Amino acid sequence: MFNGIIYNKGIIKDIKKSHKYISGSLVLEIASKIKFKKSDIGESVSCNGVCLTLIRIKKKSFLFYLSKETIKRSNFKNAKIGQHINLEKSLLHG
């Protein structure tokens, strides 16, 4: 669940076809100062209002999985390298 308040911004660094996942899916690399830990891999992150799964953490960027259905139904079908993006971590629960 997300609260709708954008605390972080990022820039799309790369968009690649995913060979590891389902055909037609993409991996989106976003550069940002947002902080993630290894234990956050697999968590949901709101990226421009779309819930995406964090799949890898790099030094200054993060990789997210986009399914074929997500691409079809969201603004990510028009995403471009260099585009700014709003980021929001999910709320803590428990």
PLM regions and their residue ranges:
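Conserved loop->alpha-helix
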Residues: M1-G94
